[in-house]
């Protein structure tokens, strides 16, 4: 005989009341009779209620020993319809294609670490892969179009594969995956798995579900605390002398043109200790240069150290403002940079991408006082016009930016500067653009990343402004920006001729096997011939140099993008800096 819902509720209430009075009897005789005909699962459920605490137990303070528990009882929390699925890759091969910024490169190493722990292998050729993963970028429309074009090619490759013998899974990761979500599944029906930047730990499950059921799987949830601090990235190029270390994720600045806060989420920082440990591990692997990464890297604040909870409040540089309340507590970026620099004195340290508002004097002091922290700063201006900067919600004026540049160059006389600029932002007039041109001329940058504005959905600019600058005008302004930048960079680099600089050799020159290329402190490429050189401190011994060697060179020639030098000797950061102080 079946029990109605109301009868079942009455049984549950009766069982709870009986348990709260300490009774050891079961349900009423009539209910007991009904239970005999009920399924075992329902009877077990009622018995558990009887053995557990009653309603009154939640209002009375009792010793834990008086509460009835069943320590040996195990509750199965697994999902029944997934129990038969094996999340392990079992040797399936993964091929990665990375688009966009350095953060995507680091994310790829995190993803491979997660997949490797779950039985996946990496392959270099897409034709050999069981899974092809595109790590995507959504900052500009051009990047998205390249990825869409690549998907068309991969769709054809997938259709040629035998679905039974060697099926191919296509996976989209990163910012484009989060931004477009279901649209990608509808428009690009060849995609099997979509995972946002904060859901990479879920990839083994998503891949298994898609493979088992033949349906697309998606997880693009953003997190308030995921930093992947517990994942040790597996380097994709173990031979490279350089590496990336992610120290924080997300961005709170909410610039009107930028999609990053919507695809990467709110700011959250890794614990300082985990960052230092990863950098030390890289040093043991032979890495000579590490770049600390974050969408707003110098707003880093580690709030896990209790002794630092009441430390200084984060105050923007004078003349700069934020859209959020000042952040308090935690270990600031200056302390992290100092800790990393001291932990690996013979390793170069860089960081990107910062916001100008967070370049405090404490950060500048660390850069000045530690020779292994590169004297190179990225100062993204975006525009040289105050009205455009207001529409962009950058939080500073043209004048404030120029004052910061002057202050930094007084603090660090030989600093190398790089920047980002956007032309053709919503409503930009010719007069406003001329302010950008004059700013580039006035500051003079060693490196610049110049772009025509690309409207992004979900951004404040998309909701509030009109993309009203014609594409031909944008492109014409972009060419003018490039020309002005190159003129300034040429003048800056000409001043380096005759200087001795320390470069880190990264590889063979693309134009000649008889030459190597490396980068100096300002992150400018330097080309040198392959010759035998003395070793620092031993003028009698001579040897060749190669990837991963620090080489002292004298700059002989220059242009806006590349320097050419003469090798002097093999050296290291400490010896080279000591010799420069003597000179």
From Swiss-Prot:
Gene Ontology CC, one term: mitochondrion
Q: How is the cofactor bound?
A: Binds 2 [4Fe-4S] clusters. One cluster is coordinated with 3 cysteines and an exchangeable S-adenosyl-L-methionine.
Annotated positions binding [4Fe-4S] cluster 1: 101, 137, 175
**TRAM domain location, by residue?**
494-569
Q: A single GO molecular function, which one?
A: metal ion binding
Q: Which GO terms describe its biological process?
A: mitochondrial tRNA modification; regulation of cyclin-dependent protein serine/threonine kinase activity; RNA modification
- The record places domain MTTase N-terminal at 92-212
What the entry lists under InterPro entries is as follows: Elp3/MiaA/NifB-like_rSAM (IPR006638), Methylthiotransferase (IPR005839), Methylthiotransferase_CS (IPR020612), Methylthiotransferase_N (IPR013848), Methylthiotransferase_N_sf (IPR038135), MiaB_methiolase (IPR006463), rSAM (IPR007197), rSAM_horseshoe (IPR023404)
Binding sites annotated in the UniProt record for [4Fe-4S] cluster 2: 251, 255, 258
Q: Cross-referenced SMART domains, in alphabetical order?
A: Elp3
* SUPFAM superfamilies from the UniProt entry: Radical SAM enzymes (SSF102114)
Domain named Radical SAM core: which ranges? 237-491
Instruction: Say if the entry is tagged with keyword S-adenosyl-L-methionine.
Output: yes
Write the record's keywords in alphabetical order, separated by commas: 4Fe-4S, Iron, Iron-sulfur, Metal-binding, S-adenosyl-L-methionine
Instruction: List the cofactors.
Output: [4Fe-4S] cluster
Coiled coil (UniProt feature): none
Q: Membrane-spanning regions, if any?
A: none
Its function, per the record, reads: Potential regulator of CDK5 activity.
Report the sequence similarity comment from the record: Belongs to the methylthiotransferase family. MiaB subfamily.
Q: Which NCBIfam families match?
A: MiaB/RimO family radical SAM methylthiotransferase
Looking up PANTHER family in the UniProt record yields:
CDK5 REGULATORY SUBUNIT-ASSOCIATED PROTEIN 1 (PTHR43020), MITOCHONDRIAL TRNA METHYLTHIOTRANSFERASE CDK5RAP1 (PTHR43020:SF2)
- Per its record, how is this protein called by name? CDK5RAP1-like protein
């Amino acid at each position: 005989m079946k029990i109605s819902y109301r009868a079942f509720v009455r049984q549950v209430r009766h069982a709870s009341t009986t348990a709260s009075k300490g009774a050891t009897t079961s349900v009423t005789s009539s209910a007991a009779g009904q239970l005999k005909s009920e399924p075992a699962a329902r009877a077990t459920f009622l018995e558990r209620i009887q053995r557990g605490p009653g309603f009154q137990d939640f209002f009375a303070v009792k010793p834990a020993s008086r509460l009835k528990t069943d320590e040996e009882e195990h509750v199965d929390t697994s999902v029944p319809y997934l129990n038969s699925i094996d999340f392990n890759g079992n040797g399936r091969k993964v091929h990665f294609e990375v688009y966009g910024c350095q953060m995507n490169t680091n994310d790829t190493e995190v993803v491979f670490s997660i997949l490797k722990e779950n039985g996946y292998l990496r392959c270099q050729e897409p034709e050999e892969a069981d899974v092809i993963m595109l790590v995507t970028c959504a900052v500009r429309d051009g990047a998205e179009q390249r990825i869409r074009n690549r998907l068309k090619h991969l769709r054809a490759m997938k259709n040629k594969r035998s679905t039974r013998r060697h099926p191919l899974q296509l996976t989209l990761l990163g910012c484009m995956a989060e931004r477009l979500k279901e649209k990608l599944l509808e428009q690009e029906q060849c995609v099997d798995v979509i995972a946002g930047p904060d859901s990479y730990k879920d990839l083994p499950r998503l891949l298994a579900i898609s493979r088992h059921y033949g349906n697309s799987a998606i997880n693009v949830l953003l997190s308030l605390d995921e930093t992947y601090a517990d994942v040790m990235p597996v380097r994709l190029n173990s031979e490279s002398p350089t590496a990336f270390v992610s120290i924080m994720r997300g961005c709170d600045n909410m610039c009107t043109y930028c999609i990053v806060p919507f695809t990467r989420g709110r700011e959250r920082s890794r614990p300082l200790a985990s960052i230092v440990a990863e950098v030390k591990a890289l040093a043991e692997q032979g890495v000579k240069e590490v770049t600390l990464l974050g969408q707003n890297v110098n707003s880093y604040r580690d709030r896990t150290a209790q002794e630092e909870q009441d430390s200084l409040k984060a105050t923007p540089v004078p003349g700069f403002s934020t859209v959020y309340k000042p952040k308090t507590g935690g270990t600031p970026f200056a302390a992290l940079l100092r800790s990393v620099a001291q932990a690996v004195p013979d390793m170069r340290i860089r960081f990107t991408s910062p916001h100008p508002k967070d370049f405090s004097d404490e950060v500048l002091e660390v850069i000045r006082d530690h020779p292994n922290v590169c004297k190179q700063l990225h100062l993204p201006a975006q525009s040289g016009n105050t009205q455009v900067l207001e529409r962009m919600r950058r939080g500073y004026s043209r004048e404030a930016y120029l004052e910061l540049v002057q202050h930094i160059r007084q603090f660090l006389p030989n600093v190398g500067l790089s920047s980002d600029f956007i032309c053709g932002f919503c409503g930009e007039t010719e007069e406003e653009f001329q302010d950008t041109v004059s700013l580039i001329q006035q500051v003079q940058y060693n490196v610049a990343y110049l772009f025509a504005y690309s409207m992004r959905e979900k951004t404040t600019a998309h909701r509030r402004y009109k993309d009203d600058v014609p594409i031909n005008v944008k492109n014409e302004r972009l060419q003018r920006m490039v020309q002005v930048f190159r003129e300034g960079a040429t003048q800056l680099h000409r001043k380096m001729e005759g200087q001795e600089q320390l470069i880190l050799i990264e590889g063979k020159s693309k134009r000649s096997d008889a030459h190597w290329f490396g980068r100096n402190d300002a992150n400018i490429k330097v080309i040198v011939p392959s010759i035998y050189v003395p070793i620092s401190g031993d003028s009698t011994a001579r040897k060749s140099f190669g990837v991963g060697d620090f080489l002292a060179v004298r700059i002989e020639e220059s242009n806006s993008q590349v320097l050419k030098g003469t090798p002097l000797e093999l050296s290291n950061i400490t010896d080279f800096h000591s010799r420069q102080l003597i000179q």
